[in-house]
């Protein structure tokens, strides 16, 4: 399972934002790392990395990261390894602690997620959804809602409006428009991102957006990255239908997984 945050196109996107990006690889390991920070000090950050096939490979990658950080005069290295092959049967936290790692006070990427396996048929994937999602997916058209897909960066303004509305109502900080727009400008032409838009038909025959979701695609995985919906039309649950459509489209595209990119653990409903 590959991650967009460790891909060549993500490196290009980060470089377009003015970041220094380091890409290294060796026997069973690789990483993309970005120089972050400012006047108070810089650090080298490998989002969902390094990628490694074993503990030995991970140690080699970590040594390389430390070496690059020293060259760049970074204060520390921030890592987010995800492959269980790295620590095997060992406790992941203990494995990393023995290598001098300490848990960061704030998580940048989601620490919990849900992966949807797309190996089944479309019917099997739909059957695997909760009943309410299945019902909305099959019947939402009866209420005049359709879902479109855009690879035009200018359409990102639709999502921005919903994100701002949601952030103001719920009191959280969201990703800046400039950042997401630049992601769209770099990733969309490369086939690595798309915007799903739910529209509601009006009495005048024109359709207006009521929900949107921005997704990233790696070689085999679609990441459900940023999404929001109109509060006014919340009873339609258009965001659900946007999600079901982007999942099925990922299957049609030949991808193997959909990463929902951040869910609360079942025993921690208030997890952030």
Task: Walk through the language-model features, giving the residues of each.
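Acyl-donor binding region in acyl/amide transferases
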Residues: 41-107, 220-272
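A conserved beta-strand-loop-helix scaffold within acyl/acetyltransferase catalytic domains
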Residues: 1-41, 82-86, 97-108, 113-234, ...
């Amino acid at each position: 399972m590959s991650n967009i945050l460790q891909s060549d196109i993500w490196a290009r996107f980060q470089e377009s934002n003015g970041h220094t990006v380091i890409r290294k690889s060796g026997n069973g390991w690789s990483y993309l790392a970005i120089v972050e920070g400012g006047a108070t000090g810089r650090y080298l950050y490998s989002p969902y990395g390094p990628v490694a096939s074993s503990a030995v490979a991970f140690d080699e990658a970590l040594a390389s990261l430390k070496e690059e950080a020293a060259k760049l005069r970074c204060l520390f290295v921030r890592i987010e390894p995800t492959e269980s092959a790295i620590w095997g049967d060992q406790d992941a936290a203990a494995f990393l602690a023995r290598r001098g790692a300490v848990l960061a006070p704030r998580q940048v990427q989601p620490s919990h997620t849900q992966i949807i396996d797309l190996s089944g048929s479309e019917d099997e994937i739909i059957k695997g959804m909760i009943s309410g999602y299945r019902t909305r997916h099959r019947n939402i058209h009866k209420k005049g809602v359709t879902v479109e897909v855009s690879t035009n960066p200018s359409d990102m303004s639709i999502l921005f409006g919903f994100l701002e509305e949601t952030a103001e109502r719920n009191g959280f900080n969201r990703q800046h428009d400039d950042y997401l727009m630049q992601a769209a400008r770099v990733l969309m032409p490369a086939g690595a991102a798309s915007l799903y838009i739910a529209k509601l038909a009006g009495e005048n025959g024109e359709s207006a957006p009521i929900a949107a979701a921005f997704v990233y695609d790696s070689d085999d995985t679609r990441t459900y990255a940023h999404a929001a919906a109109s509060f006014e039309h919340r009873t339609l649950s258009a965001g659900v239908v946007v999600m079901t459509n982007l999942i099925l489209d990922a299957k049609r595209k030949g991808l193997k997984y959909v990463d929902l990119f951040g869910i609360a653990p079942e025993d921690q409903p208030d997890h952030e």
